[in-house]
C-alpha cells in the first residue's frame, strides 16, 4: 500500500510540474487581451439609452432621466436584498465623488423595493447620488426597457451622446467600471 501511495504522489507531482510548463507569457497575454476588451469604453455597436422617463426618488420627488443627457451616466438597477449590489454601491459612491465634478452622474434604480426602504439604505451606505423607485415600472423592467428584472445588479454605462456603451450584469470589476468612466469623461 505504501508503494501505491508513493506512486500516486509521484504522478501528482509530475502532473503539477507539467501544468506549470505552459508558457506563462502566453497565458498572461490572453488575460491582458481579455481585460482590455472588457474595459474598453464602448461596445462596437452602442444602442441609444431610453432616458425618456421620470421616476420618483425616496422623498417622492420626480427625477427626469432625460435631464441628465450630456453627462456620462452610470445607471444601476439594484435591490436592497441583493448582495452583489451591496458590494458595488460603495464603488459608485466613490465614483460619484471623484468624477461627478467632471461630468459623471450615478443613478440607482431600485427595482423591487418601496420608497420607504431607500432612505435608510441610502443613509447606511452613505449614497451620494439619486436613488429612484423602479418598483412596478414594467417600462424599465421589461424587454422594451432595460430588462432590469433579469439579473441584478444590472448597470449601464451611458456616454454623453446618450448611447449605452457597456452593460454589466451581476457583480462586476471595479477597475472595469472606472476605466470605462474615465475614457468617456
Write out the residue ranges for each language-model feature:
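N-terminal targeting signals for export/organelle localization
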Residues: 1-56
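A short beta-strand-turn-helix
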Residues: 52-73, 96-99, 143
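Conserved hydrophobic/aromatic "anchor" residues
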Residues: 53, 68, 77-78, 121, ...
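Short pre-active-site segment immediately N-terminal to redox-active cysteine/selenocysteine motifs
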Residues: 71-73, 77-81, 88, 151
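Rossmann-like NAD(H)/NADP(H) cofactor-binding core
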Residues: 75, 105-107, 130
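Active-site-proximal beta-strand/loop segments in catalytic clefts of secreted hydrolases
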Residues: 77-78, 109-112, 134-135, 169-171
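Structural microenvironment flanking redox-active thiols in thiol-disulfide oxidoreductases
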Residues: 86-126, 136-143
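Thiol/disulfide oxidoreductase modules built on the thioredoxin-like
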Residues: 123-128, 134-182
Amino acid at each position: 500500500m505504501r508503494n501505491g501511495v508513493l506512486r500516486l504522489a509521484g504522478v501528482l507531482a509530475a502532473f503539477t510540474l507539467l501544468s506549470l510548463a505552459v508558457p506563462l507569457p502566453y497565458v498572461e497575454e490572453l488575460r491582458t487581451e481579455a481585460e482590455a476588451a472588457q474595459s474598453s469604453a464602448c461596445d462596437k455597436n452602442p444602442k441609444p439609452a431610453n432616458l425618456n422617463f421620470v421616476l420618483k426618488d425616496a422623498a417622492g420627488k420626480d427625477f427626469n432621466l432625460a435631464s441628465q443627457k450630456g453627462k456620462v451616466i452610470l445607471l444601476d438597477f439594484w435591490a436592497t436584498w441583493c448582495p452583489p449590489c451591496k458590494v458595488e454601491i460603495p464603488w459608485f459612491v466613490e465614483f460619484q465623488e471623484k468624477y461627478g465634478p467632471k461630468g459623471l452622474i450615478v443613478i440607482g434604480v431600485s427595482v423591487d423595493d418601496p420608497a420607504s426602504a431607500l432612505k435608510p439604505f441610502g443613509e447606511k451606505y452613505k449614497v451620494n447620488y439619486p436613488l429612484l423607485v423602479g418598483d412596478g415600472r414594467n417600462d424599465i423592467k421589461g424587454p422594451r426597457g432595460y430588462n432590469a428584472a433579469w439579473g441584478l445588479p444590472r448597470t449601464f454605462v451611458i456616454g454623453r451622446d446618450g448611447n449605452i456603451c457597456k452593460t454589466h450584469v451581476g457583480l462586476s470589476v471595479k477597475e472595469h467600471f472606472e476605466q470605462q468612466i474615465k475614457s468617456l469623461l
